[in-house]
Amino acid sequence: MDQPMKPKTCSESDFADDSSASSSSSSGQNLRGAEMVVEVKKEAVCSQKAEREKLRRDKLKEQFLELGNALDPNRPKSDKASVLTDTIQMLKDVMNQVDRLKAEYETLSQESRELIQEKSELREEKATLKSDIEILNAQYQHRIKTMVPWVPHYSYHIPFVAITQGQSSFIPYSASVNPLTEQQASVQQHSSSSADASMKQDSKIKPLDLDLMMNSNHSGQGNDQKDDVRLKLELKIHASSLAQQDVSGKEKKVSLTTTASSSNSYSLSQAVQDSSPGTVNDMLKP
């Protein structure tokens, strides 16, 4: 009926189950740790690979830059350092140009100030000159109003003495203001001198005739001497008439050539004066 209860005892199977459970837990932990180690190793390998790739690319880039510089040295650089250096150089050039332009502006402004000052001085000088010109014009007008009119100048002829012995070709020159009036005066002088010469010849012939007649009457000589005296008188009268005809012809020529120079008029008057004493001397000879 009722059986007594027996105590439970651990058998080998129980021990086996416990060991299996503990081993499974430890194996799971080992697997997790191995996975973590594998992941860390993978990450390290990837980083190393990226670094190696970067180094390779940098090396290739440097090689390509060297090759490009060797092929085309004027080719613009595209790296950051070259760009920065180029910009810095450009800024320096721009600053130098700005300084140069500032210096030029200063010099030009100084020159402009000097020119403005000179322009003002020239304006002042122009104003003073204008005032001086106005004053001089006023003085000139005043003098013209108060000035006495000048008497017109009359040209007088220069007298000269005719040389009878050793006639020279020298003719005195008289500078005159009005040559027409001088020519008219020379013609009048020539006509007056010729008229005086003819009057002198007539006055000299008449006393000679009277003297000859008186001498012929008082001498008491014959008719032969009277005839000789008459012939001499006729010859002298004929010579005087020829001289008068020459003088009248020369006067006509002078009247036709009124536009001739003063030297020709003087030479004609000299010729007339030279001829008239010769005729008188011829008449006075016995």
Swiss-Prot record:
**A Pfam family hit:** bHLH_IRO3
This protein's record includes keyword Ion transport = no
Q: What is this protein called?
A: Transcription factor bHLH11
Predominant subcellular localization, coarse grouping: nucleus
Where can this protein be found? Nucleus
UniProt biased composition (Low complexity) = 18-27, 183-198, 255-269
Which keywords has UniProt assigned to this entry? Answer: DNA-binding, Nucleus, Transcription, Transcription regulation
User: Region labeled Disordered — which residues?
Assistant: 1-34, 182-202, 244-286
CDD domains hit by this protein: bHLH_AtILR3_like
- Please tell me one Gene Ontology term that the record gives under cellular component: nucleus
Lineage: superkingdom = Eukaryota
PANTHER family per the record? TRANSCRIPTION FACTOR BHLH11, TRANSCRIPTION FACTOR BHLH121
Residue stretches of biased makeup (Polar residues):
270-279
Outline the subunit composition. Answer: Homodimer.
Tissue localization of expression is: Expressed consitutively in roots, leaves, stems, and flowers.
Q: Which terms does the record give in the GO molecular function aspect?
A: DNA binding; DNA-binding transcription factor activity; protein dimerization activity
InterPro entries with a match to the protein in the record: bHLH11/121, bHLH_dom, HLH_DNA-bd_sf
Residue span, bHLH domain: 44-94
GO biological process terms held by the UniProt record: intracellular iron ion homeostasis
